[in-house]
Amino acid sequence: MPKLVLLSSATLDEQLSRATPALIRWILLRSASHVYRDLVETEAFLRAQGDWVSTVFIKPGGLSLDVQRGHALSLTEEKSPLSYADLAAAMIEAATDPDGRWDMRNVGVISVNGPAKSPPGAPMCIFMGFVRHYFPFLHPYLPSTGPG
């Protein structure tokens, strides 16, 4: 059976994001509302296709441009921030698991040797996303933000 590995978000999973304060989660869900809506629809579609394609739903928390520190996969938690290198290694591990333990499951990723550095641009990125959610007409006038 074919297998997909979908990069999603722990923010969408009650279990994986239970350590995130409710207010922070509420802000995050609005700051990237269009992305999260797309992910919810994509996940629902892929879960409905489970009879012919298997999917692993990788759900990290916050991501950072940092060095690889080591990772672990989890069905119950995530630890943020996580480096992109650790995320990539986790996705490969989940995809190549010979027993299919992660198939059709929400999978968190833990940085096992301490968290990655907090991305310095994250607060501005979240704030700009929040503004775009409530005032979409301002989009052409707002700065682009992202990893860095």
Curated annotation (Swiss-Prot):
Disulfide bond sites: none
This protein's pathway: Secondary metabolite biosynthesis
Enzyme class: oxidoreductase
Signal peptide: 1-19
Molecular-function GO term, any one: monooxygenase activity
Keywords: Monooxygenase, Oxidoreductase, Signal
Enzyme Commission identifier(s): 1.-.-.-
Entry function: Oxidoreductase; part of the gene cluster that mediates the biosynthesis of geodin, an intermediate in the biosynthesis of other natural products. The pathway begins with the synthesis of atrochrysone thioester by the polyketide synthase (PKS) gedC. The atrochrysone carboxyl ACP thioesterase gedB then breaks the thioester bond and releases the atrochrysone carboxylic acid from gedC. The atrochrysone carboxylic acid is then converted to atrochrysone which is further transformed into emodinanthrone.
Similarity annotation: Belongs to the avfA family.
Protein name as annotated: Oxidoreductase gedF
Source species: Aspergillus terreus (strain NIH 2624 / FGSC A1156)
Primary gene name: gedF
